């Protein structure tokens, strides 16, 4: 009614979460497809955090302009120069970790779609190569009991622990205390915890996609793998490679994932969509004008 541009952001792969609503029997994939297409095609443009989202929306039949703009983070919140080595040592000690232990960190909501089970299933292979490896799982969620049963089944109680939910102010400390951050989630549209870990200076070994493969495009930042079965070999290979950190590469990447860069990209998209909206309004007015002329001509012929 107001005839002004409307920008929407589409950040969630809703199909991955349907099982939470009536065990997936109330809302189906076809409903998500229809509603997403209906809404998105009534906007001027849609912001997507990754190519995966764009590909999904195109498959739904969305024809509105789409642009990849990953959500930026507050870099300083995770760089945290105030965190000392003493702070890190104190945390590791509270987790029962010795100096020679490799702290492998998983930090997320503990739910089925986060695929933490793949990390646990692969961990026996990891500790066969690195007996000093310890998996620390941070977070809470509905899938804890199932994972605890899996840990017991694989006899990994000595090597895997849950911390529960931690205070938001302590998240950066956990990243910094870890030797490696890991994830096998396939439900991520961009993976903010990955960029948070990167900002904290912790290398990541994560299940990849088009966006993440570009994010971790330098060995000093981390490594991606393709399937659940690839997790353990990928982590073992990365640990054994002892890739040195590259501050210049990290700083360049941190700008790309910063809230500052995100803001600049959003402003540019807004400006582009204002122009696009004006052009679309003119085009529709011209089409309406031509249609009115046709109607008048037809009335004269009669």
Which residues does each PLM region occupy?
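Carbohydrate-associated surface elements
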Residues: 52, 72
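Nucleotide-activated donor-binding/catalytic signature segment of Leloir-type glycosyltransferases, i.e.
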Residues: 145-166
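Conserved acidic donor-binding segment of nucleotide-sugar-dependent glycosyltransferases
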Residues: 218-229, 236-243
